[in-house]
């Protein structure tokens, strides 16, 4: 209960929101990986939805459709469900991560549409890829409090 209260207080104060959950461990590879991944609402994407693969999250909220693209091919692409497990001693949210969908590669030429679960304060939808060093990187898909756009932010397991 205390950890949930702390997380709610951090949210209320705007601390840690969209500044990069887990950014204390970020390095140049993680930042480069994140800069090559892109997410936006389907209505804002320049893609033909009929030509895209669609992944539906459990308990999907039909209007919440995101498009994930990348500027390079990423191995071991996953769409993941995120559930807040705890807040670390440093104040970072730590998530349980459950793989919902796996694909050998997220190809730069093949956008994927995700019909997302409804998100509240913390992201409940995410993606995972393997970076150039072979490490798995997990990113939450969050809604910006400023303009309603979608953001990717690395999360901790």
How would you name each of these model-derived features?
Residues 9-19:
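Bacterial N-terminal signal peptides
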Residues 24-28:
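Boundary at the C-terminal end of the N-terminal hydrophobic targeting segment
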Residues 32-33, 124-125, 131-157:
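C-terminal partner/receptor-binding element of secreted or periplasmic proteins
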Residues 35, 45-47:
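Disulfide-bonded cysteine motifs in exported proteins
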């Amino acid at each position: 209960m205390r950890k949930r209260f702390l997380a709610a207080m951090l949210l209320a104060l705007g601390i840690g929101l969209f500044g990069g959950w887990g950014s204390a461990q970020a390095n140049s590879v993680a930042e480069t990986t994140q800069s090559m991944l892109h997410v936006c609402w389907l209505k804002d994407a320049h893609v033909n939805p009929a030509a895209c693969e669609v992944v539906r999250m459990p308990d999907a909220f039909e209007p919440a459709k995101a498009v994930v693209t990348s500027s390079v091919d990423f191995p071991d692409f996953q769409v993941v469900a995120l559930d807040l497990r705890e807040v670390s001693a440093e104040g970072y949210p730590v998530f349980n991560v459950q793989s919902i969908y796996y694909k050998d590669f997220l190809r730069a030429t093949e956008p994927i549409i995700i019909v997302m679960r409804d998100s509240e304060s913390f992201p409940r939808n995410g993606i995972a890829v393997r970076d150039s060093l072979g490490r798995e990187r997990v990113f939450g898909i969050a809604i910006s409090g400023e303009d309603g756009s979608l953001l990717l932010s690395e999360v901790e397991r």
